[in-house]
Structures are given as structure tokens and as C-alpha cells.
């Protein structure tokens, strides 16, 4: 995993994502999720290639259930783009 990827929790989400000065791509994932593991190399590549321009963050939904619930995350993997404390897109 890229050193550029930030692991966030329910407690750190506001500081790491919502208060970030750069756009943040959040990957909602779980250890048991096969498709989550499949997109991990792509996220590593994005984190390295766009370091300093976009922050890539990962949030484990099993360990941090409050944030996914707050944003209506119902399935994984889900990617969410946040900019200036606003959710721009979720897929």
C-alpha cells in the first residue's frame, strides 16, 4: 500500500477529510471484500501519482460504522470525493 494513503477512522474523519485543504478521495472498504482488494492497486497508483494534489483515504467500515451510516454508504467498495468539506460525488 502506498505511503500516500491515509487511514481514517470515525474520530479522524472530520480532520483528515472534511477539513482537508486538498480534495479527498475516500475508499470505504472491509477486509472481507474481494472487489475492495481488487481496486486497492489503482488507489495506490492514484495516491502516488497525484500526491500533493489529492489525498486518498481509506475507511474500514467494520471498524468505523458511524461515518458510512452518516453518508448513506450501503455497499462496498464505495468511493466518495470530498472537496472543501462538501461531498462532490459518491460511486
From Swiss-Prot:
It holds the Pfam family Thioredoxin. Participates in various redox reactions through the reversible oxidation of its active center dithiol to a disulfide and catalyzes dithiol-disulfide exchange reactions. It comes from Thiocapsa roseopersicina. GO terms for molecular function: protein-disulfide reductase activity. Residues 2-91 form the Thioredoxin domain. The keyword Electron transport applies. InterPro entries: Thioredoxin, Thioredoxin-like_sf, Thioredoxin_CS, Thioredoxin_domain. Disulfide bonds join 33-36. One of its GO terms (cellular component) is cytosol. It comes from the Bacteria. Belongs to the thioredoxin family. Keywords: Disulfide bond, Electron transport, Redox-active center, Transport. NCBIfam families: PRK09381.1, thioredoxin. GO terms for biological process: cell redox homeostasis. This is Thioredoxin.
Amino acid at each position: 500500500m502506498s505511503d500516500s494513503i491515509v487511514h481514517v477512522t470515525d474520530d479522524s474523519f472530520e480532520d483528515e477529510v472534511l477539513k482537508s485543504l486538498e480534495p479527498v478521495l475516500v475508499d470505504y472498504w472491509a477486509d472481507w471484500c474481494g472487489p475492495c482488494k481488487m481496486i486497492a492497486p489503482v488507489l495506490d497508483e492514484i495516491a502516488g501519482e497525484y500526491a500533493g494534489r489529492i489525498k486518498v483515504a481509506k475507511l474500514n467500515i467494520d471498524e468505523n460504522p458511524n461515518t458510512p451510516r452518516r453518508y448513506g454508504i450501503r455497499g462496498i467498495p464505495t468511493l466518495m470525493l470530498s472537496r472543501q468539506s462538501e461531498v462532490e460525488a459518491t460511486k
